[in-house]
């Protein structure tokens, strides 16, 4: 299990990555392919703490865009990040 600091460094250092975390929406642990920067822009993801949870906002490469055309997703308390 990686620390939040290790995960943040990893996503900042790699163009694409696989991030693993528990998704309440699905009720299970999932792994998603993402980037820290929105494609074709300089807009970066964010790492913040919300009510004691470590939250990473990343661009999900394979996600269906939401109604605003966005593919930003929140990984809460991710357990692992690795090269895609």
Positions of predicted regions on the chain:
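Acidic, low-complexity, intrinsically disordered interaction modules
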Residues: 34-50, 65-67
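Short, compact, well-ordered microdomains
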Residues: 55-84
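Residues in well-ordered beta-strands of folded domains
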Residues: 20, 35, 59
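A short, Trp-centered hydrophobic/proline-enriched beta-strand micro-motif
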Residues: 13-21
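Mixed-charge, Lys/Arg-rich low-complexity intrinsically disordered regions
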Residues: 1-10
